[in-house]
Swiss-Prot record:
Protein's name in the database: NADH-cytochrome b5 reductase 1
Its EC number(s): 1.6.2.2
Binding, FAD: 124-139, 150-182
Major localisation: mitochondrion
Organism: Candida glabrata (strain ATCC 2001 / BCRC 20586 / JCM 3761 / NBRC 0622 / NRRL Y-65 / CBS 138) (Yeast)
One Gene Ontology term from the biological process aspect of the record: tRNA wobble base 5-methoxycarbonylmethyl-2-thiouridinylation
Gene transcribed to yield this protein: CBR1
Length: 285
């Protein structure tokens, strides 16, 4: 365990050094762009496009106030969406699938709408030209290139969004050598979100990215992915040893998250904290 503690301390020092130097350089090239987000107030953004992906999931494109603006969201963080339902304010957090570097003048959200879901149903019922209220950025994770040699990711359902955002950022940066192994679980094959985009990322970085898709109920006899849940054995088989320079990122349904956290401890990772911080070896979005 001493080796793990030394590695953890070293990783924290490297993280803060790289975060400092990364921010000194202005991060990416849009440091001159006007950022649309504000933490202290909600701003309205107009829905300009909707693409239905599954029977209950769609990608929504929202226009910023000016076509030269960027959303201003650090990679790995999220926004808060708020509306009034039944006379009461309700809110929920979402991670956009778009990056500031590639989406100037707009941003995109991936939302699965539930009949009983206040915000998700509200967004699902939106018509082109209607507006939502958003504030941010929020969250304790901000991706910085090359802090860890390996990112071990576990995602379920729409929990893929922060993972996809991070992988896109890595793929866009030729100097980023971070390796990614993703276990992505869903109920049915049709529930797999952003599959084409994820497969394209693997094609761009075949030596860095590896994805295993898992289904609870595969409907094809020739399904080539995994079946069932993210088990201890699967994590042990797929991910590097906890003694290596690896950070575990988790996002998905509560039951999946709880199971993965228990498995992580059994594999030698530190116990996940109630509120994850950027430097933690196990980070839960």
């Amino acid at each position: 365990m001493d080796g793990i503690k030394i590695l953890a301390t070293f990783s924290v020092l490297v993280l803060f050094y790289k975060l400092f130097t990364y921010s000194k350089k202005g991060g990416v090239s849009q440091k001159e762009a006007v950022k649309a987000l504000l933490k202290t107030e909600f701003r309205e953004f107009e829905l300009v496009e909707k693409e239905q992906l599954t029977h209950n999931t769609a990608k929504y494109k929202f226009k910023l106030a000016d076509e030269s603006h960027v959303l201003g969201l650090p990679i790995g963080q999220h926004i808060t969406v708020k509306t009034i339902i039944g006379g009461k304010p309700v809110s929920r957090s979402y991670t956009p699938t778009s990056l500031d570097e590639e989406c100037v003048g707009f941003f995109e959200l991936l939302v699965k709408s539930y009949p009983e879901g206040n915000i998700s149903k509200h967004i699902g019922d939106m018509k082109i030209g209607e507006k939502i209220n958003i504030s941010g950025p929020r969250g304790f994770y901000e991706y910085v290139p090359n802090v860890h040699k390996h990112l071990a990711m576990v995602a379920g359902g729409t929990g893929i969004t922060p993972m996809f955002q991070i992988m896109k950022a890595i793929a866009r940066d030729p100097s980023d050598k971070t390796r990614v192994t993703l276990l992505y679980g869903n109920v049915l094959e049709e529930d797999i979100l952003l599959k084409q985009e994820l497969d394209d990322l693997v094609k761009q970085r075949p030596d860095q990215f590896k994805i295993t898709y898992l289904l609870d109920k595969p409907e094809r006899d020739d399904w080539e992915g995994g079946v069932g849940y993210v088990t201890l054995d699967l994590m042990k088989e797929s991910f590097p040893s906890a003694e290596e320079d690896v950070q575990l990122l988790v996002c998905g349904p509560p039951g999946m998250v709880s199971s993965v956290k228990r498995n992580a401890v059994a594999l030698g990772f530190p116990r996940a904290k109630p509120v994850s911080k950027m430097e933690d070896r196990v980070f839960v979005f």
